[in-house]
Amino acid sequence: EVKRTSHTAWSITSVSFGTAMTAPGSVASSRQEYDSSKTETSYSYVVTAVKTSTGDESVASSSTSISNNNLSSTVTNTITWNAASGADSYNVYKSRGGIFGFIGRATGTTFKDDNIESDSNDSPAIARTLFNTTNEYPATVNYYQQRLVFGQTNNDPQKIYMSQTGNYHNFNISEPLRDSDAVTFTIAASQVNEIRHLVPLSDLIILTSGGEWLMTANDGVISPSSVQVKPQGYRGSADAPPIVIGNTIIHLQAKGGIIRDLAFALESDSYTGNDLTVLANHLFAGKTVKEWAYAQA
């Protein structure tokens, strides 16, 4: 990751993808007011560590299980764990039908379950391993709606990878998916054209070697279940990065000899544009633009 923190301060650092939080260790459970003459039920729990300021959550700890009578205000299970570095709070999940669901949050290292109903729609994060082998490294990157967005690997030239909201290096997901989870999808098209550029405007514009695509959401907010991708045209874009002037994209057509603009047009309700090289065609005939820059007045 290349960072510039001042006019002359640049740094290059290695990036580790996934949560920055470590799962709590030594998770254990104990029972209170147990009666051996009554029916027993098995209970299983996992715990995650949370950094409140970022919402970053670790993957689940190892599970702990215990048998007890049916839980109540007096018959309870207590779950304990060791503190995790950097954690502000801890989420506790209980298994029901083989699925761990959220039952509560603790700021300390102990939690009491007195028959709390688990929410199976809120489950612990699942770790994913991305970008760690040859042909799996992304070729283009940008930011959109507080997510880090990657596009195009050699193995998946039309695939988009979006981080969790606000956690730029975390591409973990949950099951079922949360709205803030990482988003991964492939542009479905009749041709395979590599993604070359990602341009954030009010929508995310995806420029490929063969076309222009609009990524948006049903309600305007990107989530794993709301992503929509719509074609805007099929002219394609060259390797040289596009330039954004105001709310208009200036980009090179696929072979690099034609300059086009791309902006939202109310009359067509889509992003469209014109060939700008016709204004001075003699300057570009037989030539390919390799690099360019724009200085705003």
Segments and roles (model prediction):
Residues 1-144:
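Disordered, low-complexity "stalk" and linker segments at domain junctions of extracellular
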Residues 2-25, 62-63, 105, 115-135, ...:
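Trp- and S/T/G-rich repeat-edge/linker motifs of beta-rich repeat architectures
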Residues 44-88, 174-188, 197, 217, ...:
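N-terminal assembly/attachment segments of tailed bacteriophage virion structural proteins
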Residues 56, 99-101, 157, 221, ...:
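Flexible, glycine-rich phosphate/dinucleotide-binding loops
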Residues 95, 116, 151-153, 254:
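Structured loops at beta-to-helix junctions and adjacent beta-edge loops in soluble globular domains
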Residues 140-141, 147, 154-155, 186-297:
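Beta-sheet-dominated scaffold domains
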Residues 146-152, 160-161:
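Beta-rich globular "head" domains
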Residues 155-168:
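Short Gly/aromatic-enriched secondary-structure transition segments
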